[in-house]
């Protein structure tokens, strides 16, 4: 049976699921298009919901989550669904939970804030440019098994809840961060950029970069073990590992 993945495009997401890089026999991918509605009826027949790099604006409502949508996503994951959320440079653009940003999903993801900017790694921890985070040290987890090198371009970092969330990838102690609101760079040190969590009967993975999923990018799926990492994520979210 192929993994059934539903990809949300109704909230101004910038990244689609890289189905062309994967076996058609293993993955069945459908989409909630920008004019469609994300609700439980759209989700219930799938194994995994993917939301990739929402670019929140200050005033538009279409890139925000309504209380009903939050309730339906919680129901989907709580009943055993998998949830993959990826962010990127700019994070949640400082849009508050009250306004309906991706922060509202914190009960599922364990992430309270996606910082508005991008990681700039120190020497030996980036590939070609500082914004391409090179990861060679990973915490032990089913998702990181067999992984020796990952590349996360244009990556943000998270503030986590104190609830059941596990950090499996962090930056180096010397990592910097470029804040988008003033373009200044400051040291942030070791901060989480990939976390996993459990929500009732379901599972969630949150990654601070989305460009590692791109199929036509030198630092995307073909870089390091990025493709195997995605495969491990899908298997873990589907309770295969």
Q: Language-model features: where?
A:
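A short, well-structured beta->alpha microelement
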Residues: 26-42
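Short alpha-beta junction capping motif
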Residues: 44-99, 207
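Solvent-exposed loop/turn segments at secondary-structure junctions
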Residues: 11-13, 36, 50, 54-58, ...
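Short, well-ordered alpha-helix to beta-strand connector turns
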Residues: 26, 45-47, 165
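Stable alpha-helical elements in mature extracytoplasmic
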Residues: 14, 18, 69-72, 98-102, ...
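Extracellular ligand-binding/catalytic regions of CAZymes and related secreted enzymes
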Residues: 1-9, 13-15, 181-241
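A short, Lys/Arg-enriched amphipathic alpha-helix followed by its capping loop at the start of a domain
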Residues: 17-27
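An acidic, glycine-rich "communication" segment
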Residues: 90-183
